[in-house]
Structures are given as C-alpha cells and as structure tokens.
C-alpha cells in the first residue's frame, strides 16, 4: 500500500510562523456514577423503554393499538373518501374473484376455497391490519408453497389435503401473531433483497410451468423443481390438444395486453383490474357455446358462505411446522414490503409488528371459516392504491363483493375453463420475474447478483425449501463475513486542514513519520478482533516500507486508533486489545486512542485498559493525538518522562467548553496550515 508521508520536523523547522497547539479536553464518564442508565445493557434499555411506553399509553392508545381501524374511523372524511374507497373496493373485488379461484387450483384445492380465503380474512384484516391499501387474500407464491408441502404428505384428491391446508392457515396465523406481539419483525431484515428477488423469480417460473398442463390438455407432474416438470411435459407431448392451448393462449394475451394498457395509462387503470374477469367471461362463453370436449371445466362449486368449523388433523401439525415457518417468512416479506411502500406513498406511519399481528389474526379467523394461508398481494394492492383507496373501508367493500359472489354467482362458475384460470395465474406471476432487478444487481453489486443467481438456480433445480434455505444461508454468511471482516482505513491529513480521511479515497492526504492512524468502522467483538489485529500489523509493515526520513524515522513509534465509529466492544476484544498493547510495548510502540464513545470508554475503563495504556493517551480528536505523538517523535531523547501531558487530568474539567492548551513545560508548535501542502 502506497502512503504519502510528510516529515513534520522538516516542515516545523522551515516554518517561520507557528501557532501553539491546543488540545480539546476529553470528557470521561464516571464509571462509578450512580446513574442507572450508565450500566444498562441494550436489552434492559429496550425493555425499560418498552415498559415506559406501556405506562404512558391511555385507554384510546390501547384501542388504537389493538384495533388500528379506529385510527382512520375517527378521522374519516365521508365526502372525500367514501366514493374513492367504494370504487377501489369494487375494482379489487372484481379482480380477486377469478384470481382467488385460480390460486386455489394452484394450491391443489377446489376453487371454492380460494373464495373462502378471500372472504373472512379480508374483513378481519380491515379491523386489525395497519395498512390502509394492502389487499389481503390468496397469492400465487403462498399457494405454490401449500401445494408443494401438502402434496408430499397426502394426495390432493383426499379430504385430508383440504384439512391440512386449513390447519396450515391456523399455524401461520399463530406464528405471525406471536412475532408481531413479541416485536420480532426485525428478524426478516437478515434476508437480503437479492434472496427475495431470486426466490420469487424462480418460483414464478415454476408456477408458470405447473399451469401449462391446462394449456396442453394432459397431466403434468406436480413438483416444485423445474426438471421433473419439463420431463413430464416432454414425455406427454403425444397427448397434446389444440383447443385448450388456443383458448388459454388467447386469454393470456388478452390479460397481458389489458395489464400493460392499465399500467401505461392511469386513466385506463380499471382495464388492468377487469382483465381476469374479462378472461373468465370469454372462456365461459366459448365453453358454454361450443362445448369442446378437450377443455376441462371447473365444475360444480358449492353455493353459500363458509361455515364455522375448527381446523382438524392436529396430529399432522409437527409435519407442517417447517412449511408454516417458511410460509410465514414469505408472507411477511411480501406483505410488509408492499405495506411499507404504500404507507410511505400515502404519507402515514406503519408499524411492521402491528402489521404482522393483523395478518396473523386474519389467518387465525380465516382458518375457522375454511380458509388456507393468505397474505398481502402485490398486484391487487397496487391496483387498490392506483384506484386511490384511502382507508381500510375499501377492504370491507372487497369482502362484500366476495360474499355476494359466494351467495349468488357460484352456479355460473361451473362453466369456467381450467385453462382460463391457468392463464390468470400465469399473467399474475409474470410480474414476479424480476429480470430488471437482476440487471440492476449485475450493474451495481456483483456480490448481490451472485446471491440472486444462487437463490434462483437452487430454487429452480432443488425445490423451494432448499432454495430458500441456501439463499438465506448465503445471505447470513455475507452478513457474518462483513461483520467479521470490517472496513479498516489508514487515515491521512488533508492539506490545509486538521481533517483526517481515508487515504485510498483521498490520495492527496499525508501521514507523519513514525505515526500510523487507523480507523475501525465497526463494533469490535470476538468475531472480528483477530482480523483487526492482523490488519494493524499489515499497515505497520506497509508504513515501515515507505518511511526513510533518517535514523529516528525508520520505524513506527505510534499507532493511533480512531474509534468514533466503534459503537460496541466486548470482553474478547478488550483482552485482545491488552495483548496488542503489550506486543507494541515490547517493540517500543505507543498505542493511542481517539474519540471513543461513552459506552466504549466505560468498558475500557472497567477492564483496566485506560490505566494500562495511560490516561494521557486518550484524545477527543485525531489531530490532538497526532500533535502529541509528533512532539514525542521529534523531542530530544533526554526529555524527562514527567513531561508527558496529562490529558486525563484536563478531562476532569467537567462540562468545559473551552480549549485547554498543552502544559507549559511542553513547547508544541504547529506550522501554519498554508505551508502544509
């Protein structure tokens, strides 16, 4: 590493003008203070804030926390909002009816269960959910996960399959509610956006291929892996039938065109929402008029609202635990992501944990009325927002539309072609193929692109569960790697200033002979302390190679650690710091520390590091440390040890806002900045 080095002694001697160096006193917290907050650990601090917040809550605060709908009910503007909410609810309802039946088929269930899953959860979420635009109901990704998990346990034609799907909704709801109540939503932050994008892209491809059987007219293997599906499609090619293929492709083209037109022109956004219903109507008319024998129909659908019943088959709950946890994670990522974006767009605050609780309660109540797992939908939420929905009332209107469909329209659904439902699914998941995101990652961050590629590839070829586990594993590995290998910079002084910056970023910065300044840009703990020590040794060697300013400057005398970015230091790091100091001491190198924060300084003081290194070697600014170190580098060798500046004594001036000059027995002079180039 090439470093620019400046000989301060030469600059000092050549300067005819000099100014006295002034050191800012370092304020040291009293380690024996009776202030209880001085010794609080992060968990206790969080717990105390949480309990204090609970104590401050009034009756109405509790009502708003449990029932977020009261936040918008109290301030509802009927003349401004009602018409918008009504139209948005009708629009989403028209879109949801065909999508719900399509996603139920994707989940391996009868279409009626898609409508059941769109009824009660919608009403419950409108009361307990915190997002005012999120459209809750069946979604493609969760439906695929349900199918993939249950098909390995029981055949979809058996009644047990449906019972397990309903039980899965209860388990997912419990998971979500617990996470929301315990405020554990932050755990999802460890899953990279690259993993989410790669997973959804691969899942969209698998979903699309799984629906081709309704286009081709023959059975295709049910699998979450791409190769068995492709092999099955090729093996059954001799059974191909033209009528369902032509009808399915026609409906798919209509859906894609209507979606594109609705997105491109805001005034025609209703066309996008009407696409699925248009496709169903066209398919139903053709099937009713021409009766093509090769086109399979949905068949009879029960009429009426879902009845209350408690989920069954609890003896299979243990088998469903991994899948329910996976569905919970995917549902959270899909719902909370779009809910936050919509809240920011509509300028209101959204609590992720409250959102989790609302989704959980919706799934729990839904499972009591024959629903399978539901979550927020990207496409329907976007349509809801574009339709200018203002509050959760739009969700209530959507629920009424679904209820009317269950009561009056189900006899008409028996003539819907299966290929029409498949076309709706393929049209919906086409938007999940995030090729633009992959291009962006390739252009911006090759590591994230690698993570995207790994996740999508493993999901395609090894299945959804393996793909998610590997993707999350690599995501956590990257986080751990970054934490264990933190960024460390060698600092240099910018000419004409007292500012010290990374020399790689600012090549014009210079250092002083015999001194190396290192900034650690991360907390220091057991996982990264060895790496930090190794890097410090490397920097020391690199500095030595470029130092040749006379016999007294042929090596490093001082190492200054700039610790302002260090927010935390643990016991392992403290012990390693002691070892580093002892190692430096045997080689005649003095360690100095600049600007540690309060908690770090308290930890160092309690561990005896401050006394070990010397109180006089702790500074507020890097520049203070540099000037004192330069003085020792340049002073005559016979100067008494008693002449060391006692910065710790100066720090005893509590709350002092004035600069304190170095003691009179130390004559420190600094060349004027104009000459330091």
UniProtKB/Swiss-Prot annotation:
The places in or outside the cell where this protein is found are: Membrane
Keyword vocabulary terms for this entry = Membrane, Sulfate transport, Symport, Transmembrane, Transmembrane helix, Transport
In which family does this protein belong, per the annotation?
Answer: Belongs to the SLC26A/SulP transporter (TC 2.A.53) family.
Transmembrane parts of this sequence: 84-104, 109-129, 134-154, 162-182, 190-210, 242-262, 270-290, 319-339, 356-376, 393-413, 421-441, 460-480
Q: Which gene encodes it?
A: SULTR4;2
Q: Which GO terms describe its molecular function?
A: secondary active sulfate transmembrane transporter activity; symporter activity
Name of the molecule in the record: Probable sulfate transporter 4.2
List the record's Gene Ontology CC terms alphabetically: membrane
The protein's job, in short, is: H(+)/sulfate cotransporter that may play a role in the regulation of sulfate assimilation.
Tell me which parts of the chain lie in the Cytoplasmic compartment. Answer: 1-83, 130-133, 183-189, 263-269, 340-355, 414-420, 481-677
Q: Which domain of life is it from?
A: Eukaryota
Domain STAS, residue spans: 505-629
Q: What is its main location?
A: membrane
Q: Tell me the residue ranges located in the Extracellular compartment per UniProt.
A: 105-108, 155-161, 211-241, 291-318, 377-392, 442-459
Q: Does the keyword Transmembrane helix apply?
A: yes
Recorded topology in the membrane: Multi-pass membrane protein
């Amino acid at each position: 590493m090439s470093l620019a080095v400046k000989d301060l002694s030469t600059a000092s001697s050549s300067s005819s003008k000099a100014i006295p160096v002034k050191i800012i006193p370092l304020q040291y917290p009293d380690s024996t203070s009776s202030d209880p907050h001085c010794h609080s650990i992060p968990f206790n601090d969080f717990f105390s804030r949480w309990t204090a917040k609970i104590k401050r809550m009034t009756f109405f605060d509790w009502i708003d926390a449990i029932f977020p709908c009261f936040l918008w009910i109290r301030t509802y503007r009927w003349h401004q909002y009602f018409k918008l909410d009504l139209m948005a609810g009708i629009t989403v309802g028209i879109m949801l009816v065909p999508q719900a039946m399509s996603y139920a088929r994707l989940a391996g269930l009868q279409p009626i269960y898609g409508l059941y899953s769109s009824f009660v959860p919608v009403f419950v979420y409108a009361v307990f959910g915190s997002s005012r635009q999120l459209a809750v109901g069946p979604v493609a990704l969760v439906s695929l996960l349900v199918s993939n998990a249950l098909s390995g346990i029981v055949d979809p034609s058996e009644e047990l399959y449906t019972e397990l799907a309903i039980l899965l909704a209860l388990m997912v709801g419990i998971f979500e509610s617990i996470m929301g109540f315990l405020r554990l939503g932050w755990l999802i932050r460890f899953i990279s956006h690259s993993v989410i994008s790669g997973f959804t892209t691969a899942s969209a491809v698998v979903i699309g291929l799984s629906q081709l059987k309704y286009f081709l007219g023959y059975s295709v293997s049910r699998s979450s892996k791409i190769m068995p599906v492709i092999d099955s499609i090729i093996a059954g090619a001799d059974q191909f039938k033209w009528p369902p293929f032509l009808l399915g492709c026609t409906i798919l083209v209509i859906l894609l065109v209507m979606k594109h037109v609705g997105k491109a022109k805001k005034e025609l956004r209703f066309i996008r929402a009407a696409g699925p219903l248009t496709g169903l109507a066209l398919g139903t008319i053709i099937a009713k008029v021409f009766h093509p024998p090769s086109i399979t129909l949905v068949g009879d659908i029960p009429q009426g609202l879902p009845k209350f019943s408690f989920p069954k088959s609890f003896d299979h709950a243990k088998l469903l635990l991994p899948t329910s946890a996976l569905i919970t994670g995917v549902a959270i990522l899909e719902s909370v992501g779009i809910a936050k974006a919509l809240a920011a767009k509509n300028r209101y605050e959204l609590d992720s944990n409250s959102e989790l609780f609302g989704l959980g309660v919706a799934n729990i109540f839904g499972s009591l009325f024959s629903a399978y797992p539901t979550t927020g939908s990207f496409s329907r939420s976007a349509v809801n927002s574009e339709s200018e929905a203002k509050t959760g009332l739009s969700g209530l209107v959507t629920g009424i539309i679904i209820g009317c469909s269950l009561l009056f329209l189900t006899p008409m659904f028996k003539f819907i072609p299966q290929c029409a439902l498949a076309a709706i699914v393929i049209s919906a998941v086409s938007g999940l193929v995030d090729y633009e995101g992959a291009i962006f990652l390739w252009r911006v961050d090759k590591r994230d692109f690698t993570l995207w590629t790994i996740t999508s590839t493993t999901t395609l070829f090894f299945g959804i569960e393996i793909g998610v586990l590997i993707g999350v594993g690599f995501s956590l590995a990257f986080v751990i790697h970054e934490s264990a290998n933190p960024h460390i910079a060698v600092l240099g002084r910018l000419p004409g200033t007292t500012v010290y910056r990374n020399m790689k970023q600012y090549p014009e910065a210079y250092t002083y002979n015999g001194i190396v300044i290192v900034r650690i840009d991360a907390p220091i703990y057991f996982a990264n302390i060895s790496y930090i020590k190794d890097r410090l040794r490397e920097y020391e060697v690199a500095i030595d190679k470029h130092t040749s300013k006379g016999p007294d400057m042929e090596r490093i005398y001082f190492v200054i650690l700039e610790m302002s970015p260090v927010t935390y230091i643990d016991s392992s790091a403290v012990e390693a710091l002691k070892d580093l100091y002892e190692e430096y001491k045997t080689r005649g190198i003095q360690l100095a520390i600049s600007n540690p924060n309060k908690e770090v300084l308290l930890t160092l003081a309690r561990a005896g590091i401050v006394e070990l290194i010397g109180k006089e070697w702790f500074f507020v600014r890097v520049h203070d440390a540099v000037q004192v170190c330069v003085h020792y580098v340049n002073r005559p060798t016979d100067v008494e040890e008693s002449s060391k500046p006692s910065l710790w004594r100066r720090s005893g001036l509590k709350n002092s806002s004035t600069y304190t000059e170095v003691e009179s027995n130390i004559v420190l002079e600094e060349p004027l900045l104009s000459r330091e180039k």
